Amino acid sequence: MTRIPLNRQSASVYRAYLDAAAEVRARADDAGLSRAVLELVNLRVSQINGCAFCLNMHSKALLEAGDTVQRIAVLPAWRDTQLFSDTERAALEIAEAVTWISEAHLDDDEYTLLREHLTDDQVSLLTWSAITINAFNRVSIMSRYPVRAEK
């Protein structure tokens, strides 16, 4: 069955999401968050949600941002490695808390630990980043965006 391409059917709504994501990226840069940290969030959320289109897109973006195949490969088990910085670990905690919000709220102690490694602006922007990629995952999955073989 052919799915409704939500990005085209409701183009103005989709454009608003794109604009929101662009604003998050711009403000994140101002707040000292690298594109690589944002892409880690994008990739981890996409792994959890099982969005093939976004996994393909954000694994490439992470490599382009200078990350390694090794770190991408172990990202689902990031807690079991020493390959991620404290800032990245805090970002990944936020990504997972937002994505699994019905199951895994950050308690006050966990939230306090995040703030040892992130500024208020960074916490806010990483949360917005996780919110926006969760929305994009859902659009991509519901629309069944294809992943085409690379040549």
Task: Report residues per predicted region.
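Hydrophobic alpha-helical segments
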Residues: 1-151
